[in-house]
Design a protein with these regions (language model features):
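Amphipathic/hydrophobic helical signal segments and adjacent flexible N-terminal regions
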Residues: 2-11, 17-78, 202-212
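Helix-centric, low-specificity signal for extended rod-like, repetitive segments
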Residues: 14-17, 111, 171
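Extended, aromatic/histidine-rich regions of cofactor-dependent oxidoreductases associated
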Residues: 171, 185-210
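Central antiparallel beta-sheet cores of small beta-barrel/beta-sandwich binding domains
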Residues: 40-43, 48-55, 67-166
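Conserved Ser/Thr-centered positions that define the repeating blades of beta-propeller domains
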Residues: 180-182
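Residue-level recognition of beta-strand termini and adjacent short loop/turns
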Residues: 91, 171-173
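Extracellular glycan/ECM-engagement signal in secreted proteins
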Residues: 176
């Protein structure tokens, strides 16, 4: 998910966003702390029925994942960091938001945190994804969807080079996220990030049609 000086990726909208109830129609949910009212109103328990089968593309990831993040540095070495990713439906189930967190390491005192917002564009017939990493002044747009047995998203990185993000080896309790960049207009691709995810025990969510 973009290489923030190769140190880490990630987001923040509070972990409570994943468990709140949807509020389609009527007043927004009331919370004891007004500072959390927006978070409560944002979350949805399920995808919106209008998405149909497209909901399955990212619904399979809803929940919390423990991550082994690996960053491929320019000198050929690979740096590993631990972290987590959280997926959940938002905006009346019309979009998915995910939080990417890498834990402090390599002398850093703060975690790295960023967010992706994913929604299905009914005109383009593709998923559009916006990723933001405020700590690194980073933002990027991609779009794509299912391609065979994986999810592929394409866009342009902040340095103007083509990038390709993909979800691979997708299983009920694991998947591999890969970030690649091309320096020859898409003829060849170099892996910059490869992150191995395992679902946290007890954090499995049934998919829209009951299939993991």
């Amino acid at each position: 998910m973009a290489t923030f000086d190769k140190a880490g990726i990630c987001f923040a909208l509070a972990l409570g966003v994943l468990g709140a109830r949807p509020t389609q129609g009527g007043p927004s949910s009331q919370t004891a702390d007004p500072r959390k009212a927006m978070i409560a109103a944002l979350a949805s328990a399920n995808p919106n029925p209008s998405l149909g089968d497209e909901a399955r593309t990212f619904d399979r990831f809803v929940g919390t994942w423990d991550c082994d993040f690996s960053f491929h540095l320019d000198d050929g070495t690979v740096r590993h960091q631990r972290g987590e990713v959280l997926f959940g439906w938002i905006l009346d189930g019309r979009a998915v938001q995910d939080i990417w967190i890498t834990y402090p390491a390599y002398g850093r005192k703060d975690r790295a945190i960023g967010t992706s917002l994913r929604f299905f564009d009914t005109k383009l017939k593709q998923w559009r994804v916006i990723f933001v990493g405020p700590q690194f002044n980073y933002a990027v747009n991609t779009q794509g969807g299912l391609e065979g047995e994986r999810i592929v998203l394409r866009g342009t990185d902040s340095d103007g080079l083509p990038l390709r993000w993909s979800f691979n080896e997708m299983k009920a309790d694991s998947f591999v996220w890969r970030g690649e960049k091309s320096r020859d207009g898409g003829k060849t691709w170099k892996v910059e990030e490869e992150h191995h995810m395992k679902r946290r025990p007890g954090h499995r969510a049934a998919s829209a049609d009951g299939v993991p």
